[in-house]
Amino acid sequence: MSNAVATPVGPKSSGADARVSVPLLAELLTAEDRRRRVWADLGGAQGGLTANLSGKPGHLLVADLPRALLDGQAQWYLPDSILPGRFWREPVDRFLCWDLLNYMNGNELGALSSCLARHGANDCRVHALIQYSGKQMSEYPARFTLDGDLRLTVDETGPAGRQTPRYSPKALEKAMPDLRVERTLLLNNGMQEFLFGLR
């Protein structure tokens, strides 16, 4: 497992204008790969991701787990409880979790791990952003917008009011036994970028 530091674009900011490079996600999106790929975005729909995947073979599923959390759904953390079974007929090659893992407890992380393993292709990769600094985070998951330069704009959904779990790589592997941490990258906006593979 490798660990490095990436530099944000422009001045530091905790508001809607915070833009940050996400090298591990950029690698997934720019990989020279002519294979048909199925992507599953566990966040809300956003045009930037669709634009970056445009022209590539495959398709994109959007589960919108943040909306399920806001709506109070009991199993909001399970994408196959949000999208009916017909959406999961093909194995998924890439799962995008954004900051959602920060909002799950150990049991929920374990259930998500099983779900991703059940629907993932053999060479599946799972991307996530984990808060590693600060004691408080926004009450609900942030909104992310990916621009043409493969940088993220992070739009917090409200004031900080929730304790930050600050999951370590070892803690995540323990809670998510179906996944293994392959690479991590510290981002200077207080997040750590993670790339997981299936065990």
Cite the ranges covered by each PLM segment:
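Periplasmic/luminal catalytic loop of GT-C fold multi-pass membrane glycosyltransferases
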Residues: 82-86, 92, 115
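Generic secondary-structure microfeatures
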Residues: 99, 108, 120, 130-132
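Short, glycine/acidic-rich beta->alpha junctions
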Residues: 44-45, 108
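A short glycine-rich, Lys/Arg-flanked "PGG" loop and its adjoining helix->strand segment in the class I
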Residues: 110-125
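Conserved residues at beta->alpha junctions
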Residues: 43-44, 100
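Class I (Rossmann-like) S-adenosyl-L-methionine-dependent methyltransferase catalytic domain
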Residues: 1-31, 37-39, 45-86, 125-199
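A short SAM/SAH-binding and catalytic strip from SAM-dependent methyltransferases
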Residues: 90-110
